[in-house]
A protein has these predicted regions:
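Primarily recognizes the serine-hydrolase "nucleophile elbow" in alpha/beta-hydrolase
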Residues: 126-192
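Short amphipathic alpha-helix adjacent to the substrate-entry channel of hydrolases
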Residues: 85-102
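Short beta-strand element of the alpha/beta-hydrolase
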Residues: 67-77
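Mobile cap/lid helix-loop segments that gate and shape the active-site cleft of serine hydrolases
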Residues: 182-216
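Conserved strand-to-loop "acid loop" that flanks and positions the catalytic carboxylate
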Residues: 227-235
Length: 291
């Protein structure tokens, strides 16, 4: 494995297990957690927001009051793996605290480009927000993990979309973004095996590398908190990019917080630990969603 490949392979940096075992354990754990959440929680699965098989989302906590807060989760997998079937970590604690949880599914590379996925995420969120406004929902937070953090961050850089969502009364409902273990500069990925599916062009890199975009023309975003967080046992590149991206968006987002999670937190247990009501990110979610 080349040095660059290792830097962009977060499983190589955990102190818990070797890379292959870590990924295997994560996948098994994620599937089991999601299955248990579906069995233990009143939910609606596979709600379509688009025409493709993967353009669906799930709603956990359908028996909660109409005005219950909503926590949207966007899974990772380098834009080319996983699905919402691996995305149930936040469900038990949040639903127990009267927060609905909505994991979003989306199409994967190489069948689509990253830009297509971003468009899907926007459509999904618009659909969810429309329903949330109609039901009197109190607030919405959006969480993205790994590549999902990049997809969530994309919302901040589409001023036309924000303006449209604001005019329709949707955007003010979003009170926060939680970006966990994200990647925000895609250029170096062209030197890794991940690009075989991504097929990034130079234009793609310029458009999608949010940490190096020119944001001078971005309108200020008020009344929105962004938490950019990463574990200390994630890849050094992911740690640096998270810190740099947090600094970048401070130029137009009024409330930004960078959190480096200690205690050997890595790229995977940063979301696994959402099962724990006392985990720092879980406590922050509950705090900011007014629970």
């Amino acid at each position: 494995m080349s040095t660059e490949e290792k830097l962009y392979t977060p499983s190589e940096w955990s102190k818990r297990y070797r890379s292959e075992e870590l990924i295997s354990r994560f996948l098994i754990f994620a599937v089991n957690v999601t299955k248990k959440a579906r069995n233990a929680t009143k939910c609606l699965l596979d709600i379509p927001y688009g025409p493709t098989e993967r353009s669906k989302y799930d709603i956990y906590g359908i028996d909660l009051p109409n005005d219950a807060p909503i926590f949207i989760f966007i899974h990772g997998g380098y834009w080319q793996e996983l699905s919402k079937d691996f995305a149930g970590f936040a469900v038990p604690v949040l639903v127990a605290n009267k927060i609905k949880v909505i994991p979003i599914g989306y199409d994967l590379c190489p069948n689509v480009k990253i830009q297509d996925i971003i468009c899907q995420i926007k459509v999904a969120i618009e659909t969810i927000l429309s329903s949330a406004v109609d039901s009197g929902c109190r607030c919405v937070w959006i969480c993205g993990h790994s590549a999902g953090a990049h997809l969530a961050a994309a919302l901040l850089h589409d001023t036309k979309w924000i303006e449209c969502m604001t005019e329709r009364g949707y955007f003010p409902l979003i009170k926060g973004l939680l970006l966990a273990g994200g990647i925000y500069n895609l250029g170096p990925l062209t030197n890794t095996s991940y690009n075989e599916a991504l097929k990034l062009s130079e234009d793609d890199i310029r458009e999608l590398s949010f940490s190096i975009l020119d944001t001078k023309g971005n309108n200020p975003i008020k009344n929105l908190k962004v938490i950019a967080t990463v574990g200390e046992c994630d890849s050094p590149v992911f740690i640096n990019e998270t810190r740099e991206y947090a600094q970048k968006i401070m130029s137009f987002v009024d409330n930004v917080e960078y959190i480096l999670l200690r205690d050997n937190i890595d790229h995977f247990d940063i979301v696994e630990n959402l099962l724990d009501a006392e985990f720092v990110l879980t406590r922050l979610i509950l705090k900011y969603m007014n629970v």
